[in-house]
Every structure is written in C-alpha cells, then in structure tokens.
C-alpha cells in the first residue's frame, strides 16, 4: 500500500511539473507584446506621400557637408539599421563617443539616442544633419535652402504636407523621415509565439526564454521591442569597469541620471553588434555574461549563457526589402548649393 501511494505521488508530481512550468512561462509572457505593424503618432499622420518623401530623405547625401553621408551611412537598412562598428565615421572621418543604434523598431521606444535626449524619431532625425561630427550641415536654414532648390523635392513636400503655405521646413524634414521610420519594423518568430503559435519557437529557444526570464533579464527587457522602454544604470549591482560616459546625465544634468542609459531593444540583437553605447563588447555571449554579472549580480553558467543566446537569436526579424529599397532621388536644380 505504501509503495502504491509513493508511486501515485511521484506520477502526480511529474504531471504537475509541466503545468507549473507553463504557468511560470505565461506569467513572464504577459510582460511582452507582439510588434505593431507601425508606430503611430498623434502629431505625425503616416500618409503614403510623407513616407515616400521620408524614404528619399533617409538616403539623401546632399544633406551632408561634402555630399557623402546620409542617414543610411550609419544606419544601414540592409544591415538591420546600423553599421556593425563601435563608432560611426562622420564628416571628414570624425567619430563620436557612442555607437549608432538601429533605426528598426526604434519608433516604439520611450525616446531616442542612448541618453534619450530626443523624445521622438521626428526630433532625432533633425540632430545628426546639423552635428559637425556627423553630417555637418551649417544650419537648418541651409538644409531648407538645399531642398527648395531641388524641383523634385518641392513637389514631394507639397504632396506630403498638403495645404501648407510653406511645406519645406526643417520640422517637416524631421516629420517625413520620422514617418518613414515609424514603419521600420521587423517581426520575428517571437511575435508568432506571442500570438499563440507555440510551435513558432523550438524547444531550445523556449527553454532559453525561461532562462532569460528567470535570470531577471525581463525586468528591463520587456514590451514589444524587448527593451527600449526605460532607463537603467550601467553597472547596477556592480560598478561597470572603466565607465567614463555619464550617460543620460550629459543630456539632463540631473545627478541621479549619471551612468543611466536607455535600455536597448533586443530585437535583431544577434545582427547588431558590437554592443553597448561604446561598442566595447564584441560578442553576444560576452554581453549576456556581463549583464548577468554587472546588472543582475549573477554568475551565469556557460550553459545558461548559451541558452539565453539561443532565445535571443529568435528575435531576429525579416528586413522588409521592398519597403527599404533605395528610391530614385530627384536631380539637383541649377542653383542647388553645396555645403
């Protein structure tokens, strides 16, 4: 009788384990949402004319000093929206102190840039063009002068901003680029999984998600972008070695913002190294291990690290080739100025 009772208890325990595992998994999954098809804006209607204009402007070299750089120079759309360099070369080969984050899925983030200094992709688009270390244009007025001198852009701005007496403005430049970027989304098998298709991920990837979640990674990396929705201190539980960049503090001058950075999205993370704001971490395995040590206070085993990396690779989406295809750019006018 005692043996039978013991066997029955063991069988019941085994039966309950998958149920408990599913319950744990479901509780973590509630922290995520599938990617939307676009990131809508209350202040920037996404019309076809505006998106088409934004696509042209994204690839436009004439909005840089020397006419050699465009948004796509650092945020290459055929390479998941970045250039795989620690620092991107700007005007005359100058490099900044932070790596170029991906433009894919960026519009759904809480803010733009590593320090969050731009509240939207529309505002972000206006920054690099005038930065002397990036595209190097002398002023917003000069950018407008260039655009107004190109007949094709005169017509494109009229179509994108109908009813405006003076549609070619620097703010409208930002709105057009922003409209294009708001549909730069890369859904993956992870989204299918979140929508209920439990066959979308392999058993190893599902196990990797469980490891990722139970380790505590989901505290910061959650939501539709698997990150991008909060700021966090780099070196949260253990001081990050040789950290000089003061992060968000450099934008806000608020003492408590020192060493805080926008939490990066993990979408397409397997394709967007090197990692961190300074590109100092070369591999995904090293990044996961360091996050465990410095952000979570945990020494992840090699098996745990590998398991998490397996899950992260499932976040790789498909680049929308037709949407990002470089359009034919309008020809310069007879008096188009050069910076």
PLM regions with names:
Residues 20-339:
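Periplasmic c-type cytochrome electron-transfer domains
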Residues 10-13, 339:
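Short, linear, compositionally biased motifs with a strong N-terminal bias
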Residues 1-7:
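Bacterial N-terminal signal peptides that target proteins for export
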Residues 7-9, 19:
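Cleavable N-terminal signal peptides
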């Amino acid at each position: 009788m005692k043996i039978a009772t013991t066997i029955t208890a063991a069988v019941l325990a085994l039966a309950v384990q998958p149920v408990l595992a599913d319950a744990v998994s479901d509780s973590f999954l509630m922290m995520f949402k599938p990617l939307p098809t676009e990131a809508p804006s209350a202040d920037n209607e996404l019309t076809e004319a505006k998106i088409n204009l934004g696509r042209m402007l994204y690839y436009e070299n004439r909005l840089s000093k020397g006419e050699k750089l465009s948004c796509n120079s650092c945020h290459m759309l055929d390479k998941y929206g970045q250039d795989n360099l620690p620092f991107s070369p700007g005007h005359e080969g100058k490099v900044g102190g932070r790596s170029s984050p991906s433009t894919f899925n960026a519009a759904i983030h809480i803010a733009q840039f590593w320090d969050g200094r731009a509240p939207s992709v529309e505002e972000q688009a206006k920054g690099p063009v005038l930065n002397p270390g990036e595209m190097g244009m002398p002023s917003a007025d000069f950018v407008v002068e260039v655009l107004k001198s190109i007949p094709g852009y005169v017509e494109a701005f009229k179509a994108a901003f109908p009813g405006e007496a003076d549609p070619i403005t620097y703010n409208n430049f930002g709105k057009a680029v922003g409209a294009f970027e708001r549909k730069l989304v890369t859904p993956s098998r992870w989204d299918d999984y979140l929508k209920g298709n439990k066959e979308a991920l392999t058993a190893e990837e599902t196990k990797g998600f469980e490891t990722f979640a139970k380790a505590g990674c989901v505290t910061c990396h959650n939501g539709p972008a698997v990150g991008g929705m909060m700021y966090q201190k780099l070196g949260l539980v253990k001081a990050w070695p040789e950290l000089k960049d003061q992060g968000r503090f450099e934008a806000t001058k608020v003492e408590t913002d020192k060493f805080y950075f926008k939490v990066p999205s993990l979408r397409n993370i397997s394709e967007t190294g090197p990692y961190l704001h300074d590109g100092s971490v070369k591999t995904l395995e090293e990044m996961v291990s360091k996050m465990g040590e410095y952000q979570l206070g945990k020494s992840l085993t090699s098996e745990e690290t590998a398991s998490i990396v397996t899950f992260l690779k499932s976040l790789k989406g498909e680049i929308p080739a037709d949407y990002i295809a470089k359009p034919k750019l309008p020809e310069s006018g007879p008096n188009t100025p050069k910076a």
